[in-house]
């Protein structure tokens, strides 16, 4: 099982790299620095199962995504249990989001960010379904130091 899981995690890492390469090439960008942050995996070197967290060893660079509108936090790990939260966390389940949120509000919240993905199939990924940036910033202090907040100019979410 562990062997197959390692192969799957390696495949996922290479797949993410391929997606980044396609986007960077298509937009004519050149990467200055890259790093990878993954969540919901087994760190076989440290034998830590991370569900809802990411590796945050002392000085390790990591990304904490917030939502489609607010962007992400680039952070440096503080070695608090070698982990930090992997994202903002949901305020509501996917089903509850589909039932409670409106496309009109979703469209309004995403104004100013280029995306073709503000569609009914991604309503459960709308900013309103997640905790706020302010709440996350207030809570992550023991786990990670915020280096920079990055804001989206382009957002893509795959739908079924």
Language-model features, listed with the residues they occupy:
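Domain-length cofactor-binding catalytic modules of enzymes
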Residues: 1-160
